UniProtKB/Swiss-Prot annotation:
One of its GO terms (biological process) is rescue of stalled ribosome. This is Endonuclease MutS2. Residues 707-782 form the Smr domain. Belongs to the DNA mismatch repair MutS family. MutS2 subfamily. Homodimer. Binds to stalled ribosomes, contacting rRNA. SMART domains: MUTSac, MUTSd, SMR. Keywords: ATP-binding, DNA-binding, Endonuclease, Hydrolase, Nuclease, Nucleotide-binding, RNA-binding, rRNA-binding. Signal peptide: none annotated. The lineage of its organism: Bacteria, Bacillati, Bacillota, Bacilli, Bacillales. GO terms for molecular function: ATP binding; ATP hydrolysis activity; ATP-dependent DNA damage sensor activity; endonuclease activity; mismatched DNA binding; ribosomal large subunit binding; rRNA binding. Pfam families: MSSS, MutS_V, Smr. Its EC number is 3.1.-.-, 3.6.4.-.
């Protein structure tokens, strides 16, 4: 279809509303590509797709598509030998996770809605590949940010060495900073980090007392950050280990990327299917917002839109109208007052057809019928071009000439105020001639006009119908109701009377018009009354038929469910009975066998108590079943994070780290962390651990997230600020508040200049009114 038509009908606004309902860039891309189809089979299939998903969306809670993203670029990069990072691998993992959740949802849906078929969704679910191995390979190797320590044996060893070396460095430096002899020589008794090296803050005047490397100094120059020589080699060792760690991480990521490349075709299919589902769900969401319904498409030319309304207008205030081209009608001419809704009716018809052929449910009552148009042509509104210096009439006529060149029997043509902008008699003649030409071409036409000559046009030609927009004489305003089959009538006398014009003048005016025109107006008035009555009856009949069909469908469904339930009960009862008979027969055979053995061993001397013992074995059999059921119950006890559990499928103990959802949990078994079904876990009582004496060393005091420098001299304030920032970094604070007061602003300026240069500060800002305003600076730490 022509882009100009889509622009006039504001289809881009509809696309924008659908786009707002998408979750991923995959769905958004498909919305941006959405265009009306013109092939009958394609149009029908697109509508079936949307309607099926809309039915499911309206009845069920769909799985979340959050986190779904386009990953084809990563897949192609993996295929040509690139190495994916952890973030990219996680997006691929999320794609697999989303598709698996949708598969699970669909399987449950099929079980719950027994007898209901979803052929389109079923086909999409069958297209989804099995990517379980790749999911586990990524999931068990990395989290959201980094590789797990146990991603490889080598990586675990390297990180273990880094940890132990760091611990030895800390112990060494702790001895230095806790030494009584060094207390006065240190700016603070802490260990900090500069240039990725562990250092201690030494007062500048005691530099010669510490053998080591100076890595940094405070802004005031009074504190030097020294790496003691006793830890230099250990820090060097950590640097080497970090290098080894990077190499091993690259190796593991290369291996994972290879797995992705091996599954590239399957991943691209998964991306395409999930993107299409996001697109269809967005259509379903938008359709529900406009209470959209599914039209029936027919090969023969048909337009029937019961109670249609323009989807971009306010649903609460817009007047819905039935728009219909009755059998053998090819042209509809709408007359009525200006601003009465004629143009909106044209746009409603055009936009609904464009929406329907794009696979969107349409804003009408159930039962709408449409044919598929190859093109929709519009001449709507004043498109006068100032640059071309065209008049309103010339502008419209230029557009009409272009339409007449391309319109055919597969087209819908919409003319707004046909023939307007020139002499009324010439304009009316042109309008009738243009309509004759379009009818000869075979296009379906709806036109609006205010020329009275066109009212009689339909009575002289076959296939032409009049319509009008209603005017309320009592309120002197249009009602925006469309009356199909009823031409517009003049309301001049009624309006004049309502406004207070003398009856003598009105009566004299009536004598000046012909008898025929009087009779025509009276006939039109009678037609209006009859149309309203028939339309009300037809809507009521449609409602009753729809109600009856729904009741029939519900009863059929319930009857089918009852038959299925009855069948399943009978099968279940037979199975239970067969199991009991089988068990009893086996037990009886065992008892007889044992009795025979006893008789052979003891002759006929079989005691009563021995028979009782054998009989008791049947009772024992049922008790064993009871015990088994108790164990089964125990397995389903509520499990929470921190619980000790037995993993039944592995026979191993583990600890629950996190409850993912109602069905899955993350469990640590030794050095292995796995996501497992909760039904596979059996809760265990934690063993009571004997209390052990703990020796705690406090390396630093707990600090607040704010530092109050009010009352400090400038130099002292900066020294205090330096020490505070070091402690805040070691406490892993992300944000701290420096209170300097307002005063002259000198301290505030000094603090902010100091923060600007400080290596531990990534950013800072003035405080919000709720935080202290200009008297506070908020610093964000690296």
């Amino acid at each position: 279809m022509r882009q100009k038509t889509l622009d006039v009908l504001e289809f881009e606004k509809i696309k924008s509303l659908v786009a707002n309902e998408t979750i991923s860039d995959l769905g958004l891309e498909k919305v941006n590509q959405m265009m009306p189809a013109t092939n009958f089979e394609t149009v029908v299939f697109q509508m079936e797709e949307t309607d099926e998903i809309a039915q499911i969306y309206n009845k069920h809670r769909l799985p979340s598509l959050s986190g779904l993203s386009k990953v084809s670029a990563f897949i192609h990069r993996a295929d040509i030998g690139g190495v994916l990072n952890v973030s990219e691998l996680n997006l691929i993992k999320r794609l697999i996770q989303v598709q698996n959740q949708f598969k699970t949802f669909y399987n449950q849906l099929v079980e719950e809605d027994e007898g209901v078929k979803y052929p389109i969704l079923d086909d999409k679910m069958n297209q989804l590949p099995v990517l379980t191995d790749l999911f586990h390979q990524i999931n068990e190797t990395c989290d959201t940010y980094d590789l797990y320590d146990n991603a490889s044996y080598e990586l675990q060893g390297i990180r273990s060495k880094i940890s132990s070396t760091n611990q030895r460095i800390r112990q060494n430096l702790d001895r230095i900073v806790k030494s009584q002899a060094n207390q006065k020589k240190l700016s603070d008794a802490i260990v900090t980090v500069r240039n990725e090296r562990n250092v201690i803050p030494v007062k500048a005047e005691y530099r010669q007392d510490f053998n080591g490397i100076v890595h940094d100094q405070s802004a005031s120059g009074q504190t030097l950050y020294i790496e003691p020589s006793s830890v230099v080699e250990m820090n060097n060792q950590i640097s080497r280990l970090r290098h080894d760690e990077a190499i091993e991480k690259e190796r593991v990521l290369t291996q994972l990327t290879g797995y992705v490349a091996a599954d590239k075709d399957a991943l691209l299919v998964a991306e395409q299917v999930m993107g299409q589902l996001d697109f269809l769900i967005a259509k379903a969401r938008y359709s529900r917002s406009i209470k959209g319904t599914k039209p029936i498409f027919k090969e023969e030319r048909t337009v029937y839109l019961p109670k249609a309304y323009h989807p971009l207008l306010n649903r609460e205030t817009v007047v819905a109208n039935t728009i219909e081209f009755m059998e053998d009608i090819e042209t509809v001419i709408i007359t009525g007052p200006n601003t009465g809704g004629k143009t909106v009716t044209l746009k409603t018809l055009g936009l609904i057809i464009v929406m329907a052929q794009s696979g969107l449910l349409i804003p009408t009552l159930d039962g709408s019928q449409l044919s598929v148009f190859k093109n929709v042509y519009c001449d709507i509104g004043d498109e006068q071009s100032i640059e071309q210096s065209l008049s309103t009439f010339s502008s419209h006529m230029t557009n009409i000439v272009e339409i007449l060149k391309h319109a055919d029997k597969h087209s819908l043509v919409l003319f707004d105020e046909l023939g307007a902008g020139t002499d009324p008699s010439e304009g009316a003649a042109l309008a009738m001639s243009i309509l004759d030409h379009v009818r000869k071409i075979g296009s379906l036409v709806m036109a609006t006009t205010h020329y009275p000559e066109l009212k009689a046009y339909s009575y002289n030609r076959e296939g032409v119908m009049n319509a009008s927009v209603e005017f309320d004489v009592d309120t002197l305003s249009p009602t925006y109701k469309l009356l199909m089959g009823v031409p517009g009538r003049s309301n001049a006398f009624d309006i004049s009377k309502k406004l207070g014009l003398s009856l003598n003048i009105i009566n004299k005016a009536k004598t000046m018009i012909g008898t025929d025109e009087k009779e025509i107006n009276e006939m039109i008035e009678s037609l209006e009354r009859n149309y309203k009555r028939v339309e009300t009856q037809r809507l009521e009949l449609d409602r009753l038929v729809k109600e009856a069909e729904q009741v029939h469908d519900d009863l059929s469904k319930q009857y089918q469910q009852f038959q299925n339930y009855e069948k399943s009960l009978i099968e279940e009862a037979k199975e239970k009975a067969n199991q009991k008979i089988k068990a009893a027969t086996k037990e009886a055979d065992d008892i007889i066998k044992d009795l025979r053995q006893l008789r052979e061993q003891k002759g006929a001397d079989v005691k009563e108590h021995e028979l009782i013992d054998k009989k008791k074995r049947l009772d024992d059999h049922y008790e064993a079943k009871s015990i088994k059921q108790n164990v089964q119950k125990q397995k389903y006890d509520k499990i929470v994070a921190g619980d000790e559990v037995k993993v039944l499928s592995y026979g191993q103990k583990g600890e629950v780290l996190e409850i993912v959802n109602d069905e899955e949990a993350i469990v640590q078994m030794g050095i292995i962390k796995m996501k497992l079904p909760i039904e596979d876990l059996e809760k265990k009582q934690k063993e009571k651990v004997k209390p052990t004496k703990m020796v705690t060393r406090q390396n630093r005091q707990t600090i607040k997230t704010e530092l109050d420098l009010r009352g400090y001299r400038y130099e002292d304030a900066l020294i205090e600020l330096d020490q505070y920032l070091d402690q805040a970094v070691l406490s892993n604070y992300e944000q701290v508040y420096i209170i300097h007061g307002k005063g002259t602003g000198a301290l505030q300026k000094g603090v902010q200049q100091h923060l600007k240069k400080h290596k531990s500060v990534s950013d800072f800002r003035g405080g919000m009114p709720s935080e202290g305003g200009f008297g506070v600076t908020v610093a964000t730490l690296k």
